[in-house]
Amino acid sequence: MTTTELTGWPAPTASGRVDAVVHLPGSKSMTNRALVLAALAAEPTAIRGGLRARDTELMMAGLRSLGVGIDDAGDMWLVSPAELRGPAAIDCGLAGTVMRFLLAAATLATGEVSFDGDPRARERPLRPLLDALRQLGAELRDTGGRLPVTVVGSGHLPGGHCVVDASASSQFVSALLLVAPRADTPVTVGHVGRTLPSVPHITMTVAMLRERGVEVAGTDGSWRVQPGPIRGGTVQIEPDLSNAAPFLAAALVTGGRVRVPDWPMRTTQAGDALRDLLTAMGARCELDATGLTVTGGPVIHGLDADLRDVSELVPTLAALAALADRPSTFRGIGHMRGHETDRLAALAAELTRLGGDVTATDDGLVIRPRPLHGGVFHSYGDHRMATTGAVLGLVIPGIVVENIQTVAKTMPTFVELWTGMLR
């Protein structure tokens, strides 16, 4: 065990205004969707720019255990689809995309496929997806609607109509849509919950299906997918815009400038909302064909916003709000209690520990800026909590992030990129 693992990671303090260009790795959301679609396709797929991180490594390991061929050619992966076969044991880690997307795909396999993961993964919601898959004809064994789960595969999924309460996670809908083209009959998915969070992630799923020749109809709340082949070909993964959040926040915190090359002009990624959100908080955001440049202003403004569509951005936005000129209110994010940790409780606890004034409400956070001081910032094994501590450390001396290694879930190179930004 290293000294950093024992004592925590001293978050570096910026010596002045940050002025940096940060090249980000590929999108986790796009990478794992692309891997599942490639595994279910009618022909091989080349994936370029895919993210190499724990979540994607777990996805590839799971697909390989089901018989899918994945050759690593350095700058791309060549995925050779195959009939999925058990028996297999899938380690989901803490990856929601693995425990939901791959579980749905396993209903097409022959034989038994078991799923389990990290202790926290056993607490993450899964029952609505299991119920919906059963409505489509899948056979599953579970205890209490959470991991561990065993899929008893017959080699096909009958299809038909299902309803799902996706209030806890839009990944339930995406999982059903991803497997739907391989069902025996058309699949209709209806959302019956009170709210539907993270809609851009469903939009991404639909767009990626259509790009591969799948016929998908419907809008938020109801979707219909026709059975048919999924095309292969070449897929280019965009940079991970949500993982850009802490780096772009550095521009606001230090009054500096950060540029992210290859930011897409049009995208379905939820992280693209950073352009509007950071502008509202006082930044200047300039997008052109080569990338996005964010320049911080003299102060950070508080933010009053419904963030249900972009909840993965909330930890970074909370750090900015703690340093702002007026209180902030974040709404529509009650589902964050079921993320890698209860992020609402965790953010309230850690910001308060450093001298902040934060209240976790039923569906959000109220953050009242106060003078902050150094101290240990606990990550709760959550990559976005860890990067939040790094943002605060830019201007609050003495912050030590516990378990910075958890960033390996989606960005193993975070510390290298972060320290490089400050050189």
Curated annotation (Swiss-Prot):
3-phosphoshikimate binds at K28, S29, R33, S169, S170, Q171, S198, E312, H339. Its EC number is 2.5.1.19. InterPro entries: Enolpyruvate_Tfrase_dom, Enolpyruvate_Tfrase_sf, EPSP_synthase, EPSP_synthase_CS, RNA3'P_cycl/enolpyr_Trfase_a/b. It catalyses: 3-phosphoshikimate + phosphoenolpyruvate = 5-O-(1-carboxyvinyl)-3-phosphoshikimate + phosphate. It comes from the Bacteria. The keyword Cytoplasm applies. CDD domains: EPSP_synthase. Pathway: Metabolic intermediate biosynthesis; chorismate biosynthesis; chorismate from D-erythrose 4-phosphate and phosphoenolpyruvate: step 6/7. Phosphoenolpyruvate binds at K28, G96, R124, Q171, R343, R384, K409. The active site is at E312. GO terms for biological process: amino acid biosynthetic process; aromatic amino acid family biosynthetic process; chorismate biosynthetic process. The keyword Transferase applies. GO terms for cellular component: cytoplasm. Belongs to the EPSP synthase family. Catalyzes the transfer of the enolpyruvyl moiety of phosphoenolpyruvate (PEP) to the 5-hydroxyl of shikimate-3-phosphate (S3P) to produce enolpyruvyl shikimate-3-phosphate and inorganic phosphate. HAMAP family: EPSP_synth. This is 3-phosphoshikimate 1-carboxyvinyltransferase. It comes from Acidothermus cellulolyticus (strain ATCC 43068 / DSM 8971 / 11B). The gene is aroA.
